Design a protein with these regions (language model features):
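General beta-strand structural signal in soluble alpha/beta enzymes
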Residues: 43-47, 113-114, 174
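Conserved active-site and cofactor/substrate-binding residues in soluble primary-metabolism enzymes
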Residues: 26-30, 91, 95, 99, ...
Length: 245
């Protein structure tokens, strides 16, 4: 079974979708959760695909159960966010990519996929890089986001989704941010939003509290981060390719 079931009709025109799958540093997950919360986005749809974990999730403020992968919408901003509360392996991501493709085409959705690249934390802010397929290449350039400057690859579920975009000739954007692989990294998520998502979408998102709430966010995401570390290669991440493999 593969379907997207609408929960609350929201009118959007050629929207941009932000991918929030958990990966290294939980950068995409933190950024997506922040967008949903800060922008007061509407729970628009649920995603049902065979490869996704068959679990029900709940959040502390509500007794309502939900599926683990959901789509939120902000009609006034033509923005969608794909929120996932569980790690998703590459096999499941391949099914998910096929599941989402028709829906993306039907609604003229442009996806932005988020990944972290492992780096040692220093004093300077994390670097952000952009990649694209189709019109996504020009979108990254027009937003002033630099290419990585070296060969590399994106693995895990985000890599599968980007690969599907390449194979099918669809437009997509990939954002890669330097992050701490050992802990959830709100600073890297802040960079994704402020220097990547904002210029690409034109949506203004307050991000200062991401740094102010670093310890709170890390504690809340610690258990999921441990599960992602245990998953190893299944985590979404970018990494450079050396000359010799």
């Amino acid at each position: 079974m593969a379907k997207i079931s609408v929960q609350d009709e929201v009118e959007v025109t050629e929207p941009t979708l932000i991918d929030g799958f958990p990966g290294v540093g939980l950068v995409g997950k933190i950024a997506a959760d922040h967008l949903v919360e800060t922008l007061g986005m509407t729970h628009h749809a649920n995603v049902h695909c065979d490869g996704l974990p068959k679990v029900a999730v709940y959040h502390g403020e509500s007794a309502a159960l939900q599926p683990p992968v959901r789509i939120y919408a902000a009609a006034d901003r033509d923005l969608l966010v794909l929120q996932s509360d569980v790690p998703v392996g590459p096999d499941a991501a391949a099914e998910l990519a096929a599941c989402l493709a028709g829906w993306f085409d039907a609604h003229s959705v442009t996806p932005i996929y988020l990944s972290g690249i492992r780096t040692e934390k220093g004093e300077s802010p994390p670097e952000l890089y952009g990649l694209g397929t189709g019109d996504g290449v020009d979108a990254v350039t027009d937003a002033g986001i630099d290419a990585p400057g070296e060969a590399g690859l994106v693995s895990g579920p985000t890599g599968v989704l980007l690969n599907h975009a390449v194979e099918s000739g669809r437009t997509a954007v990939g954002l890669i941010v330097e992050c701490d692989p050992r802990f959830p990294d709100p600073e890297a998520a802040r960079t994704l939003i402020a220097r990547g998502i904002e210029p690409l979408t034109g949506v203004d998102v307050p991000v200062d509290d991401l740094l102010e709430r670093t310890e709170q966010i890390r504690q809340a995401k610690e258990r999921l981060a441990k599960r992602m570390q245990d998953a190893g290669q299944e985590s979404s991440q970018a990494r450079p390719l050396g000359m010799y493999q």
